[in-house]
Amino acid sequence: MAQSTGSKKVKTAIFISATGSNLKSLIKFSKHKKSPIIINLIISNNSKAKGLRYSKIYKIKKKIFDFKNSLSEKKVINELKNNDIHLICLAGFMKILSKSFINNFKGKILNIHPSLLPKYKGLNTHERAIKNKDKYSGCTVHFVNSRLDSGKIINQKKVRIKKLDTPKNLAKRILIQEHKLYPAAIIKALSL
């Protein structure tokens, strides 16, 4: 993993598909003096993603790609390399990256997932945790590999499931923890 050296921060791209609440949290984290990252690029597969507004607010370059085929992915790879990106953080990015893409940035792609992996990979994590009467759910930051939500776990945070929880209110409580966990996981990942 690329390490930040002294005052030199790791150039980072954030991939989003929707609201960008983790993006906003990571931007705030990157502005801290002791943060090891600088966010140089926001990439989305959705031109209507609400999170793209942070590009204007924080003056960060944004690019939209459809990720529909290998040609599109090559354009993304070129954009990342042209911007000297050394860390990619997936933050609510709802596309599965190809093995070829992942191999281009092996060990440099992180993802945040709203469950305690390896439980509940994929979608509808909160519904499944409640349906199965789990006592805890939570969130996980992991390295991305070619298998869905299966990369090496960096950090996790447990959140107790309350008796009257709905998927929506459990998701809100987990999201609060995601905003704390992702920055800590980035620091840990960069030190590995």
Model-identified regions with their sequence ranges:
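One-carbon transfer enzymes
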Residues: 1-192
